[in-house]
Amino acid sequence: MRTNLTKLFTIIFVAAYFNAKAQTDSITFAHTGWNEQTIAKGIRWKSFHFENKSLFNANENINIIEIAPKQKHYRLHVVHSDSLETTSQLALRNNALAAINGSFFKMRGVDPDDNKKIDGKPVLERSKLDYNRSVVYLRENNLVIAENVEKDNKRKRHQQGSIAINKKSVSIVKDSADINWEHQLKGQDVLSTGPVMILEGVDQKIPNDAFDNDRHPRTAIGKKKDGTVVLLVVDGRASESAGMGIPELQKIFRWLHCIQAINLDGGGSTTMCVKGQPFKGVVNYPTDNKKYDHEGEREVANALVIVPR
């Protein structure tokens, strides 16, 4: 009897502790003194470095760009590279006001850019001039650049949701049973990614695995009820910023009052650029050089950019 009571009290204590900690985190986030800068009418860049392990019992560095609804002068746009380019290169090439890295892709392997050889002979993949490395459905300006490819009739986590961009709105949608569901989405730009974190104001179930639970740099996009679009990156893999698991990222978007949110490619790909800022516009701390600085960008296959209409 005493053993059962001890177990019961332990369960109650642990539950109460984590509930109190969650409330503390939400209060901390709600009272954040963001560093804010208007980079264009209706477009704000916000950043904050949570120190002293004040958020999720960790240090966290977060950058956010908010795009007000009914934006007249700028639009969100999906762009791709014929091979691989850094997010800042994609931003510059498209005259972007700001940019974040996009969805998942095949990293550079044995292609001409690497000059790999076997027995003295170059080993080549398909030419970078006619091959996009995105491993998700990508539609740009109504042109399909890449397709989702199912394996064993199953979609991978990064193929289970999409961002659909129209002239005046951005939507986040979840996949359907139809194998060609992305083709039916209305939008001049469509980019598949995942997992979906929030849909119609409801938290979506997040798989209990290492990809989702472990802390990494993360890139994601959300949408508020009034139509405001939220682009977010959180740095990681450093003592200055631990990164987040998907459940923690899900909470951040809920606290930002988003009714839709979806994860993008993260890790060493995570990058945000703002035009006119130093370090080629890179404002976060990309990790591909394993240093906590602004110079560790990874080459990526696609990005989300804010460009003039």
Predicted regions and their residues:
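Bacterial Sec-dependent N-terminal signal peptides
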Residues: 1-26
